[in-house]
């Protein structure tokens, strides 16, 4: 195993932070951990502005900030203030959204404050498929709100936020991908990012809490679908994207062996980025999710710099640089190259 580097031997502070600005969500999506945990209300789920400022100000080389976790960012009451705070410091900032709360007024404000990117989750080309995956969502409202965001940009001649549609590909919605590419191109969207399920959750299961999402991932993962069928749908989606002028990003649908040089990690996250929950728990990346699975430290007890240079991070980096990665990484779609 690679030597654990603590203190001055640790890597420089991260250039990218992903902050869960709220853990509250207005939807309950079939593939999301939110659907398998107790409900979290808006007040309990919000990251305090004081913690947000402390993180931004305490990470001097920060170049990119993603305001995204298990919750819906538009439920964070200080979201616009957060975006303005980092834009004033020259930091690129954006987030993912289900767009249910993206009214025209909110769209106008996000454009005005200089949001760099906004990724809209849309996992179907029909209301039946989409609403079957995202409980409490409304397909027509999302379509209306996405078009409203495009209009808000046109109204002031703004190039940002860059808009991307994110499609989480599963057994139940794969067949609609070519139609989705064609549909969103008609709304002025020029980029679609297709992702696989984020994790198989097979590595750890505290008190049985992850049994439900583990069963879902096992049944719905593209790894369990006929590879020829997946390849055919991807090829048709690619042809459609070429025809309508949409940039299409497709994942591998079968795991790719992690090829690396000795002592080189299979993933760079713990060296250049960190994920922080709304309550201040520091985790090695955004794919870990539940803070009972892996935690590097708590910002209520130490600063990010001390946690970053601490023993827990050093041991995690050393394991990730070895032939036996941390158990939580083994089932991760980023590590397996299927995300």
Residue ranges with predicted function:
Residues 78, 105-109, 173-176, 226, ...:
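Residue-level recognition of alpha-helix termini/interfacial anchor residues
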Residues 42, 50, 89, 112-302:
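Radical SAM enzyme [4Fe-4S]-AdoMet core and its adjacent flexible, acidic
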Residues 79, 135-138, 309-312:
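Amphipathic alpha-helical protein-protein interaction surfaces
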Residues 1-40, 57-60, 242, 253-262, ...:
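N-terminal pre-core extensions flanking Radical SAM catalytic domains
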Residues 36, 69, 122, 196, ...:
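Residues that line or immediately flank small-molecule/substrate-binding pockets and catalytic motifs
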Residues 1-117, 128, 132, 140-141, ...:
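Conserved alpha-helical substructure of the radical SAM core
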